[in-house]
C-alpha cells in the first residue's frame, strides 16, 4: 500500500529515465491514488506531508529488542536503517595465547569471520520476524543502507568477496522490488523524495562499504560511480530538506582524540574524501542539508560550521541493541560518561536538553526528526531517544539557518565559528589528553594494587612471625 508521494532516484545509466519508466511512474501514482482511501493508516495520501522520521542502527537480531515499542509509539512515517541491521558475521573470543590467537603480538587468526549465505539469511529472517519491528513495518515505510556487520564482515570494504551476496540479502530484507536498479548496480546507494512541492524531503542513502578503500589508505569511500551519482542528486531539483544518510559518522572524528587506544570508522579517517563531500555540498548551493549516521554504539549530535555555506549537522544514533553501557557492569556506567565528557571534541553540540553533561548517550537509542512545516520560521527538531522513547539529546534547527549565505559573512560571525577546528588540528597534548588520562588512571590502579598486595604480604609476614614466637 502506498501512503506517500515517493519518487525513487535511480543510479546513473539505469533505464528509469526512459519514457517507458515515466509511463510506469504515472501508472504507479494512479494506483496509489486509487488505493489511498483504503490505507490502514488514516488519511495519509500519496501527497501527504512527511514530518516524522525515525532512524536507527546496530541491531543484533538475537538480542532482546524492546526499543521497537518506543519507535512505534513515536509513529514515524518513514524509518531509516543506517547499517548493522543485523550482525551477520561471527567473532572469536579474545585470546593472546593458545592455538587461535586473536589479539596481541602473536595474533595468527582474524577475530571476525563471515557467515554462510544460509546463516545470513536466517539472521535476517529472525530480525524481520521480530514482533515490534513487524508492527513498525505495517505503519511506516522502511528504507535503509548497510554498514560492516550486515555487509558481511567487521570493518570490511571493497575487498570483501561476499559483497554481492550480501547486497542481495539486504535488498530482500528491505523488500526491494525484483526490477529495482539497486539490484543491478554495484552498491546499495539510492534516494527517495517525499511530499508535495514546497514541503519536500529528500533522503539520500549512501553506501560506505562496497567501494571503500582500506582504512589506512586515505583513498575513496564512495567510488567513482557513486560520486558521479551523488553529484547529480545534489545538483538536481531542489527540496526543502535533504537528509544524507551515512552508516559511519561524517563530522565527528573520534579516532583523532581517542587514538592510539581506540579507533572508530568515520569519514574523518578519509580526510580527502570528506573534504570532497563538503566541497560538493558547498558548490551545489543546495539548502536544508544535514546528515544522519550510526555505527559507534552511542548517540550524539555534532556540527561543522566551516564545511559549506551554512552549518552542517550530523545526528548519530547507535545502537538499537548494541550500546557501550550495555557491555559494562551498571556501576561502571559513570566511568563511561566521565570518559565521554573528558574526551576532547570540537564538533559535539552542547545543549541544556542533554541528559548527561557530555551530551552523549551510550544506552540503547534511536534517532528522530520532527519537521514543523506550519511555524514561521519552519523548524526541525532532531533527537536521540532512549529505550522508553524519552529524549536524551535534542537540538532545534531553524530551516532558515540551513540556507546558503555569503561566505565572508559566515566566516565573520562568531556563532558560526564555534565548530570549525577539526579534531586532528588540536594541539598535540590536548588531542591526546584522553590517552594520557587513561594511562594515568591505569597506572594509579596498578600502583594501588601493588601497594595493596605489598601491605597484605607485609601484614601476613608479621602475623606469621608473631604466631611462631607464640
Question: Which residue ranges define each predicted feature?
Answer:
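Classical eukaryotic N-terminal signal peptides for Sec-dependent ER targeting/secretion
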Residues: 1-27
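Metal-dependent phosphoester/phosphodiester hydrolase catalytic core
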Residues: 22-24, 30-470
Amino acid at each position: 500500500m502506498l501512503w506517500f508521494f515517493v519518487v525513487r532516484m535511480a543510479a546513473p545509466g539505469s533505464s528509469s529515465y526512459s519514457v517507458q519508466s515515466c509511463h510506469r511512474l504515472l501508472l504507479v501514482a494512479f494506483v496509489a491514488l486509487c488505493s489511498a482511501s483504503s490505507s490502514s493508516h488514516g488519511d495519509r495520501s500519496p501527497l501527504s506531508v512527511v514530518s516524522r522520521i525515525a532512524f536507527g542502527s546496530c541491531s543484533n537480531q538475537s538480542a532482546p529488542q524492546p526499543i521497537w515499542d518506543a519507535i512505534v509509539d513515536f509513529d514515524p512515517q518513514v524509518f531509516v536503517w543506517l547499517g548493522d541491521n543485523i550482525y551477520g558475521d561471527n567473532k572469536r573470543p579474545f585470546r593472546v595465547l593458545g592455538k587461535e590467537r586473536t589479539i596481541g603480538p602473536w595474533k595468527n587468526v582474524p577475530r571476525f569471520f563471515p557467515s554462510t549465505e544460509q546463516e545470513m539469511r536466517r539472521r535476517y529472517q529472525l530480525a524481520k520476524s521480530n514482533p515490534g519491528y513487524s508492527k513498525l513495518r505495517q505503519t511506516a515505510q522502511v528504507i535503509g543502507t548497510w554498514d560492516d556487520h550486515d555487509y558481511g564482515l567487521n570493518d570490511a570494504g571493497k575487498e570483501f568477496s561476499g559483497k554481492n551476496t550480501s547486497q542481495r540479502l539486504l535488498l530482500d530484507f528491505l523488500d526491494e522490488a525484483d526490477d529495482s536498479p539497486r539490484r543491478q548496480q554495484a552498491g546499495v546507494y539510492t534516494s527517495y523524495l517525499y511530499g508535495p512541492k514546497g514541503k519536500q524531503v529528500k533522503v539520500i542513502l549512501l553506501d560506505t562499504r562496497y567501494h571503500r578503500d582500506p582504512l589506512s589508505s586515505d583513498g575513496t569511500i564512495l567510488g567513482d560511480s557513486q560520486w558521479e551519482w551523488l553529484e547529480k542528486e545534489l545538483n538536481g531539483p531542489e527540496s526543502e530538506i535533504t537528509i544524507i544518510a551515512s552508516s559511519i559518522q561524517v563530522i565527528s572524528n573520534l579516532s583523532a582524540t581517542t587514538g592510539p587506544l581506540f579507533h572508530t570508522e568515520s569519514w574523518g579517517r578519509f580526510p580527502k574524501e570528506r573534504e570532497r563531500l563538503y566541497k560538493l555540498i558547498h558548490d551545489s548551493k543546495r539548502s536544508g542539508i544535514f546528515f544522519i549516521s550510526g555505527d559507534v554504539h552511542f548517540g550524539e549530535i555534532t556540527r561543522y560550521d566551516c564545511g559549506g555555506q551554512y552549518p552542517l549537522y550530523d545526528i548519530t544514533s547507535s545502537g538499537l541493541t548494541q550500546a557501550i553501557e550495555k557491555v559494562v557492569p551498571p556501576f561502571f556506567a559513570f566511568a563511561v560518561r566521565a570518559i565521554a565528557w573528558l574526551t576532547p571534541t570540537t564538533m559535539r553540540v552542547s545543549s541544556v536538553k542533554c541528559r548527561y553533561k557530555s551530551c552523549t548517550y551510550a544506552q540503547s537509542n534511536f534517532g528522530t526528526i520532527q519537521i514543523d512545516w506550519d511555524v514561521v520560521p519552519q523548524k526541525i527538531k532532531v533527537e536521540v531517544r532512549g529505550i522508553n522513547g524519552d529524549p536524551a539529546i535534542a537540538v532545534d534547527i531553524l530551516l532558515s539557518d540551513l540556507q546558503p549565505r555569503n561566505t565572508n559573512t559566515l566566516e565573520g560571525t562568531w556563532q558560526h565559528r564555534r565548530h570549525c577546528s577539526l579534531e586532528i588540528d588540536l594541539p598535540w597534548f590536548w588531542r591526546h589528553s584522553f590517552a594520557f588520562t587513561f594511562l594515568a588512571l591505569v597506572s594509579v590502579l596498578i600502583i594501588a594494587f601493588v601497594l595493596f598486595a605489598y601491605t597484605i604480604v607485609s601484614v601476613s609476614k608479621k602475623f606469621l612471625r608473631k604466631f611462631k614466637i607464640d
